[in-house]
Every structure is written in structure tokens, then in C-alpha cells.
From Swiss-Prot:
Originating organism: Sulfolobus acidocaldarius (strain ATCC 33909 / DSM 639 / JCM 8929 / NBRC 15157 / NCIMB 11770)
Keyword annotations: Cell cycle, Cell division, Cell membrane, Cytoplasm, Membrane
Domain remark from Swiss-Prot or TrEMBL: The C-terminal 18 residues mediate the interaction with the wH-like region of CdvB.
Pfam family, one: CdvA
Function: Part of a cell division machinery. The CdvA, CdvB and CdvC proteins polymerize between segregating nucleoids and persist throughout cell division, forming a successively smaller structure during constriction. CdvA is a membrane interacting protein that recruits ESCRT-III homologs to the membrane.
Compartmental location: Cytoplasm, Nucleoid; Cell membrane
Signal peptide positions on this chain: none
Recorded consequence of changing residue 234 to D: Loss of interaction with CdvB
GO cellular component: cytoplasm; nucleoid; plasma membrane
Membrane topology classification: Peripheral membrane protein
Subunit annotation: Interacts with CdvB.
Description of what induces expression: Induced around the genome segregation and cell division stages. Down-regulated after UV irradiation, indicating division inhibition in response to DNA damage.
The protein, known as: Cell division protein A
Consequence recorded when altering residue 232 to D: Loss of interaction with CdvB
Amino acid sequence: MGIPVEVLTKFIGQKVKDVYGRDAGVIVHVYTEIDGTITGIELFKGEEIKTYSPNSVKVDGDSVVILPDWKTDSLKVLGQMEKIRKRQRALEELYSRQEIPKSTYEDMKRKLDSELLKIRDEHSRLKGRLKDRLNSIEDQVAQIDRAMIALKINYISGEIPELAYKNSMEILRLSRDSYALERDDIKKTLDKLDGLDKEVIELKPSASLNTSTEQSNKNEGNKSEVSVPIPVRVINTL
């Protein structure tokens, strides 16, 4: 169930953060349908206005947090792949127990395979996006580390006062920590995507039905191997 519009509209005009503690902007508008269904949330940050989907917004206690686009899309793909996996297992189980005919099995298998193909295409593109974001984060962390080192040098050399040094270091530390949280989250998400993809199984014909077919073929083969009497011709030599 989505967030009730009455709850979200209370945060209009307020600053919100993302799930990693960074400023995401100010909620300036909530788009809704006549029935109250939320269709989008508009945030203003700096000089930019961005519209987020309802799935990108989560109420956390007395505050609202924003999910990055990659996380929203990852949750969607993971959910779809999990559903496909469960349906595959259910179909295979029914077929192995001979509770559905082969024609129904093959028809449903084709549909599942078609859906799986689409999801795997999206899965592949998503992994590419996550890896790109991971590289971007690594660059940001490296830049923050360089800034922290330069700041320490300037402080130790007496070029900046202690208060300015502490304030700047705290800002850099919080920024680095938030990037580290996102980096770890992306790595875990990539692991989940890889793991679930391996669990999505290729359906195979029932073992019991295979055994029956093999037994039938074996019986047919045995029939062909039954010994046939060799005709004997007796020649009278008297």
C-alpha cells in the first residue's frame, strides 16, 4: 500500500533527505488523481526541480526519505524475478506430480520464458547502471579523501583556524559516510541480482514422465531384440 496523500502533503515545504542521510531537497508539490492516488512527488534542490515516483518516497517515523532511482528500479526487478522463480518452481512441481497435462505445461512454460527474457534484459541494463554509479561513488570518495588530507595539512601548518577546520572536516566526514553507505548498498544489490538470477531455473520435463518414456522405449527395444528361430534345412545325403 502506498503512502496516504494526507500524510505526504504534511511535508510540503519541508526539507527531506535521501536514505543515506544526504539532503534531497524540498517537497514543493504532490501530484494526485481524483481518488487521492499519488502519481508523483516534486522536489526542489538548488536550481533544479525533479519529480519522483511514489515508489521512491518512504515515510520513516516522523520524516520522509527519498530512494535513489537505481534502488527503486532494483526493488522492482528483484520483485519480478522472485515472482518468476516461484512460478517456475510451482509449475515444475505440478508437472512432476502429473497434475497438469503436457500441453498446459508447455504453454505456461513458454509464457514464463517470454516474461523472463524481458526481465533479464532489464536486469542486464540495471546492473550496468549500478556499476556506473559505483564508479562515480568511488571517484567522489577519492576526491573527498584528497580534500580531507589537504585540509589537515592546512590546519597543521596553521593556515586555517581550528573551528573552520572542525566544521569542514565534519561536513566531509558525513559526506564520505553517506557515499560509503550507498556504495555498500549497491554492492549488496548486485549480489542479490546475481544470486536471484542463478536461482531462476530452466524448467525440465518431469523425471517421472521421462522415466516412463525411457521405460517404454526400452520395452520397444527389448521386443526388437527377441531371438528369432534360425531356419534349418536338412539335406538328405543318402
